[in-house]
Amino acid sequence: MIPRWIQLVGCLLLALMLPPSAAKKDKPGISFHKLHEKPYSMFYFEKSDTVLLNLEDGEVLRSFDAGENWEVIEDNGMKHGVTSIHQHPFDEDKAYALGDDGKHWITTDKAKTWKSFKVPDQAYFKSPQTGPLTFHGRDSSKVIFETRPCPSCAPRSYYTTDDFDTIEVLTESAVGCYWAVGNPQFAAGPNMPKGMEERTVCVVPGLKASSRFAFRLVYSDDYFRSQGIETKLQDGRPVSGVTSIAQVKSFIVAAVESQGTTERALYVTTDIEKWHRAEFGDHRLEQDAYTVLESSDYSLQVDVLTNPFSGMGVLFTSNSDGTYFTRNIEHTNRGPRGYVDFEKLAAIQGIVLVNTVRNPDDVEAGASKEVVSQISFDDGRTFQPLKSTDGQRIHLHSVNSDTNLGRVFSSPAPGLVMGVGNTGDYLGKRSDGHLYVSDDAGLTWRLALKGPHKYEFGDQGAVLVAISEAPKVKKIEYSLDHGKEWKSVDLPHEVDGETSTLTTTPDSTSLKFILLGHSKGEPSVYAIDFEDLHERKCEDEDFDNHWPARLDEHGEPDCLMGQKQFFRRRKANADCFVAEAFNSSMSKFEPCKCTVEDFECQSTRTEDGKDCVPPKSFTPPDGDCINPDDTTMIPSGWRLIPGDVCVRDDGVNLDKDVEIPCKDVNNRPKSKEITSTMKMFSSGLSAYRYLERQVSNLGEDETVLMLSRNQELFVSHDHGQTWQQELKGASIMKIVPHPYNSDTAYILTDSEEVFYTINRGATFGSFRAKTLPDYENGPILRFHPLKRDWLLWVGTECDSGSCHSNAYFSDDRGDSWKTILRHAKKCEFEYKENRPDSLYLVFCEQYENEDDKKRLQLMSTTDERFSDWETVEENLVEYATRAEYIILASHTDKDNALKARVSVDGTTFADLKFPPNVVPAQNLYTLVDASEHAIFLNGTTYVLSLDAVNQNDWGYVDFERMQALEGVIIANIVSNVDELSDGAPKRLRTMITHNDGGEWTLLAPPTKDANGKKFPCSVVEGKGTEDCALHLHGYTERADPRDTFSSGSAIGLMMGLGNVGDRLTSKDEADTFLTMDGGITWKSVKKGRYMWEYGDSGSVIVIVSEQKSTKVLHYSTDEGATWQDYYFSDEEIEVIDISTVPSDTSKKFILWGKKSDELVTVNVDFSGLYDRDCEFDDKGGDVSDDYQLWTPKHPFQEENSDYECDYNYERQNDGTCKLVPGLKPHDPVGYCKAHPDAIEYFEPTGYRRIPQTTCQGGYNLDHQTAKPCPGKQQEYDKKHGISGIGLFFAIVAPIAVAGAVGYYIYTKWDGKFGQIRLGETSTGTQGILSRDSLLVTVPIAIIAGIVAVAKALPLLVTSLWRSASGYMRVGNRSYPRPYASRASFAARRGDYSSVVEDEDELLGVVDFDGDEEEDS
């Protein structure tokens, strides 16, 4: 027997001989590292233990051992210089550290080394995840870096193709730029378009408008070195209003919004070139009301908000090309930021966890949500409740209440899922929840730990780690058997579980974890290591090598996309670790026979959702359908989902052709006939309003609301073919369309009840206003340009005994109201997109001291509660808004005359000062028009544009801006103003301008009338004269102000009623005229008076007799070259109006007429006139066979067509601008006072740029002589002068070069001084420095010429000045701020094309220095 002490000694010796790593530990190791600053962000590098940690003080720490040891990165100035860190999503070795001063860093070796790079502008963060960086999906060295040079500047995109060794400007954009291959799966097939790897996609501003509704989507294959190609989003045509794009696996999604609607459109592509609009059935995509979710390789999943106030949505899944979406589940739970409680399980295909609201009706009525959890095992086709092992229903907190990093429920550990929730009827508070775990991919769940916990997965699911979310936690808990049993280990310090973060490697294969938390208020990091917890590594018998990822209702492995998925997974009770760090469990697949689930619809499903709609148009093969009773084979409408690998043998084949009768084949061509539909009504017409679809609206409706004189409302969704009476029993008084949303209209009644529609008359809702509407004191309802449901209501209140009007505000479409101002007369929202801090800006007219007998004041507020009001004007007459301007008129205290002021920002107002020789007294203003950066106010603005504009008794004037073409305006003037005081009738003439009022001319008359007869007068060179011109009846004579000369879509076309002669005659003598070139030339198209409308963007023009019974209309499809007749009725009716949609893009029209006292509507449909739509292709030399590239021609070609006369200057007969006698130019130094940062100002020249001009370069008539602003001499010299070293080289360098060249020539030239050679002649064999060499003779000649010119130039300048000063008035410039005159360029020569004859025009503007010297 061996003594016991010998056994003990032997055991000790054996223990000492064994390596330390072989010793088994009973708990994981924990190391602690204290941080000196709060952590800002952290991430692991894929497939490594390397971690980056960014602190709030700008330091970046790195750890190469999963958090046990940390060091501060100081490479290339990184210490304290990093504001954010970002991981490359597709390259596991790369990361980026961004600074705030344009200096940034990149690592390409998992943080071992860092390289700095510079980007000129400030970084612009497009998203919190990637910051300013946009990555290429297949080439990690290609990155786009977004910047914004200044807070108000447009984003500027830079790019690199070599990991920022070099960086170049890509382009300036409106939203940002992206790589087309933004995901490795995008365009990865063999038929990838050429240039795809270099292709970039950008959302850029509109060509003219800066509004977001004009944003365009363009792409380039050469980094925009050449002009980009605009994407054809809709039916092969570009679409404006692209606000964002998203890259989701093999899809790119573009979001489009249109002005006038809150409905949005999504366009989807899989190759950038072919786009399709995503269709969601009868669901509308509203603003901020859809979320593109994590999607599969073969479909998109989108959640659509159903009600902006309910926080619920509908989950849709698309087909394989992202075009048609099928509803999966309704009432999904959405958070306030649009996040959806939705997650796909990692690693396993087709399993989706989603939270829904079980009481949607109660929620919409104001109740709290009752959220329940559901799971799908077939990629969202069907859902079922989450069940515990004992059959109880479980509900889990999801995305909207997650408190940890990464995924909410799952990890790459196959089949392991955890979540915090509760059993019962619906989800409770997170603080009352418990931790649940499932090891069968969510099929069954069991309670893991009491109370809410943060959790993580490690070692492919062999280790589960959790920490309580209690405020004070001293331990972590872990499980080694899929959550059945749990153990705990103490932390070195107590941490705050609520704010802690638990994480591990992204692939969940590591045995190491990191806990970020706060200990005693100080940030700290804990590294938790399970590597030494077990002695052995798992062997083959410890694994289930055929674990099924999904089970069907019978518990058998389920198929998805034609295959079953299996994993090799460690058994739950195995006493071992997988210990294969960074080697994820690989799945295996087995094929399945094809079933219905393997097929999708090529287009849309049938109404019952059980079948697919066959193709709408199909041409039978030759030989089929000879007889009507024959049958033919057509596609079924089904197709196998691309990427599905099911076995067709003995399986379902839904995509095989089906047999149908030939009579059902829908391939009949259009009838090429015009159709008409007449409807009769028992009373007359009171009003009609269109609610027009915008680009982003779905549907084919053309909706019209019509109010009869019997106060009945009728609605037509097919442009008057059929009508339905709505709101029966209500006494309708007025239709008020929402001016900023064409889907919305309000229907006012004779009571407090107001009806409304937000879907173009499909449905109607109602509310009760605070007061009865007051129809006598101006507008009742006012609308917010941005917030569709914000309303202002001004109504009369009589509760206190005396009636007065109050202003009320509603932010929920009339459901609730708040009184914002009493004794108010009119209120307006004054929000503008480019007006800072104007979301809550409201202007109201209010009687002083709330006394209706006192004077009117203008009040304003920017307070979101509309309670803090300021007085803008104390003696108001009226105010109005146009474009970016707010104009107000008030009485002066001195003589009670009118004065006007203008504001752009709604806060600061400036007086309008009119030229005193033009407007001696101000009695009435009419704000007739405003374009970008300019206003026309009763024919006058800051400069005189046109004098003696015709005005009626109501203050309206004959003034109309041509739509679509910039700068074209038609106005009527009174040519005999001096005779009016004697009682003479007005003699009107029509004037036109093509440069926004800078110059006006008479309309050029046609030579012949519509019957081919010559007019009584004629002109030469196609220019109107005072004796012979075309004159048109204008705005003041229209029964309906919507009947304009032009159309926004019929480019260049205008029509009007008028006559040829020396003045405008009676309307009874008028004929109908048309122009195709923006008013330069006109032709007579019909004798007599006709009403007109443009259709299909001017492709169809329809005219009908005015104030005369008829049964025929006339139409033209060639812009008025020829006309055809169409008889719309067997009996004559009196047509009182003709209309179409406001955009003039429809092929349908309505004739509004009457027979006796009854209303008649006639829908005239030109849709069948052609059997195809026009095709547009701008890639070729010409646009296409269906389109021509038409460029508007300006009637003037002179340099100063981009300029107008400056304040107190007026146009002369020769076209030049001269100072008005007795007036002074403005003080140019005032510019420096208004712009404190300005360095210089320019002396007045008499000219200033027209606000609308976009010309660049050329001759600047308004900027000639620059002078330094007061106190800015040094900055001015620096800008225009030359530095000391520059001056040194400018003097010394030429002398040195000349000396060197002279010395060389002296030593080499055969004709140098002192050499006299007789009898020698030059030959071709002489050297290059011979006296006859060109290198010698030419420079000598040039030098001699320069010397001669230098001597003669002063004499020439002196001579020219003496000549010019003999006839030019020269004004002193040191006077107060001027107010210019925009005189008639028409007084010049009538055509810009004539040669400038004035010397001052040829040589430039007048130099005023001479006068300054004389005055001094």
UniProtKB/Swiss-Prot annotation:
Residues 24-1284, 1355-1416 are lumenal. It is a multi-pass membrane protein. One of its GO terms (biological process) is Golgi to endosome transport. Gene3D superfamilies: 2.10.70.80, 2.120.10.10, 3.30.60.270, YVTN repeat-like/Quinoprotein amine dehydrogenase. BNR repeats lie at residues 62-71, 374-384, 436-446, 478-487, 714-724, 808-818, 1077-1083, 1115-1124. Pfam families: Sortilin-Vps10, Sortilin_C. The chain crosses the membrane at residues 1285-1305, 1334-1354. It is found in: Golgi apparatus, trans-Golgi network membrane; Prevacuolar compartment membrane. Residues 1-23 form the signal peptide. Residues 1306-1333 are cytoplasmic. Belongs to the VPS10-related sortilin family. This is Vacuolar protein sorting/targeting protein 10.
